[in-house]
Swiss-Prot record:
Protein name: Large ribosomal subunit protein bL31B
Signal sequence annotation: none
Subunit structure: Part of the 50S ribosomal subunit.
PANTHER family: 50S RIBOSOMAL PROTEIN L31, CHLOROPLASTIC, LARGE RIBOSOMAL SUBUNIT PROTEIN BL31C
GO BP term, example: translation
Species this chain originates from: Burkholderia multivorans (strain ATCC 17616 / 249)
Keywords: Ribonucleoprotein, Ribosomal protein
Coiled-coil residue windows: none
Gene Ontology MF terms: structural constituent of ribosome
Entry GO terms, CC: ribonucleoprotein complex; ribosome
Protein family: Belongs to the bacterial ribosomal protein bL31 family. Type B subfamily.
Gene label: rpmE2
Top-level taxonomy: Bacteria, Pseudomonadati, Pseudomonadota, Betaproteobacteria, Burkholderiales
Pfam (any one): Ribosomal_L31
Amino acid sequence: MKPGIHPDYREVVFQDMSNGFKFITRSTIQTRETIELEGKTYPLAKIEVSSESHSFYTGQQKIMDTAGRVEKFKNKFGSRASGKVAK
């Protein structure tokens, strides 16, 4: 491998924001945040879903905030989202 052209492959902590679960793995992800875990400082990558919170792995169904998404869409696009296609 050529020196200086590859990203830094290092240990990183990934934190599931839905339940706080943290795990250490190796990654090339770039992040500014750090966290101290097990007496050592690691870069921190925040993720929305992991195997600890995804319904496929947990077997539990979670209700997502789809109503908030619909309202946000309606506020953003208003009458343009009437369903009619302009020709």
